[in-house]
Amino acid sequence: MTAPDDTDRRLIAATQAGLPLDEAPYARIAAELGLTETQVITRLSILHAQGVIRRIAIAPNHYALGMIANGMSVWDVDDAQAEALGERIGALDFVTHCYLRPRAPVWRYNLFAMLHGQSRAEVEQKRAQVRALLGAACRADDILYSTRILKKTGLRLKDG
């Protein structure tokens, strides 16, 4: 993998907050950076193939869509099954983030999944679906509800 050059970094900086809402977003970015639309698309494709950019996707604001109940569900599952179970949970359409994390002496949970709903009752129903999917592999679970957004962004490269 080749490290991103200055042009790649400028391209990442120009797109990291999202693509412009435009009929031709890549052409608009190209004009801002002094590139052609083809160069922008090619560079983004290479950065994606190298794993520098994981994905380019629409990311709706779930709060604006009425999804105001958000909880990080945490699960204590057998370590030997955790990856396979995490993949199954991550495939659920109502799970937006799913992570394996190391346990800590005072924290038994190793599988985390973010659930969203229009109410806590809806999120609890989704939690019950995850619990049913995990079955006997789930030894314990909990949910940590968001109370306030302090910061919400993706990775940002510093200018310069």
From Swiss-Prot:
It holds the Pfam family NirdL-like_HTH. It comes from the Bacteria. Its EC number is 4.1.1.111. It catalyses: siroheme + 2 H(+) = 12,18-didecarboxysiroheme + 2 CO2. Keywords: Lyase. The keyword Lyase applies. GO terms for molecular function: lyase activity. Gene3D superfamilies: 3.30.70.3460. Pathway: Porphyrin-containing compound metabolism. It is an enzyme of class 4 (lyase). Forms a complex composed of NirDL, NirG and NirH. All proteins are required for the total conversion of siroheme to didecarboxysiroheme. Belongs to the Ahb/Nir family. Involved in heme d1 biosynthesis. Catalyzes the decarboxylation of siroheme into didecarboxysiroheme. Siroheme is probably decarboxylated to monodecarboxysiroheme, which is in turn decarboxylated to didecarboxysiroheme. This is Siroheme decarboxylase NirH subunit. The lineage of its organism: Bacteria, Pseudomonadati, Pseudomonadota, Alphaproteobacteria, Rhodobacterales. The gene is nirH.
